[in-house]
Amino acid sequence: MIEQEKETKQKNEWVSWLKAIGFALVFVFITKAYFFAPYMVEGASMSPTLHDQEKLYVNKIVYAFSEPQKGDIVIIKGDDKRYVKRVIGLEGDIIQMKSDDLYVNNKKVKESYLQENKSEAKSLGVYLTEDFGPLKVPNGKVFVMGDNRLNSMDSRNGLGLIETKAIEGRSEVVIYPFSEMRATQ
């Protein structure tokens, strides 16, 4: 009788552990699928802000409650792959680049994250970004660019204007390599 109670108690303990593990797996799957996910940067288009092979923590739910904002670093679902870019203009904005200065709605935008790249371009005797615009961003779309303007496929040259529904989430933090952990917003 005591032996049978012991076996029943062991079985109940195993069942309890299996339920806990199952719940944890379902929780992780749902969290990753709908709320938060890792993303690996591929290429140098966001350098020096983000580097090739860095891993990011992406907030996938933020845009369920709000719209992308200028300056957000976002993950975009393309036809064949995902891209990481910075939001430069929102629907209705007029975007223009003149002599390496960005203008949104005829106001010059300070892009402090480009200082390193602008200095490098200046030393080469070139502009970091070719002149373009003015261009009005249509409803339901955003204009994005990579921080490495000389080496980025973005709204200027290949990706085109991005539908807001193609934005999968906002980068929040670099999580790997550990020595480079930092907020990205």
PLM feature spans:
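Hydrophobic (often cysteine-bearing) scaffold residues that line and stabilize catalytic clefts
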Residues: 18, 23, 42, 67
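Aromatic-capped interface at the extracytoplasmic side
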Residues: 30-46
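Hydrophobic membrane-insertion alpha-helices, especially the h-region
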Residues: 19-34
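Soluble "head" domains of membrane/secretory-pathway proteins
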Residues: 2-14, 26, 30, 48, ...
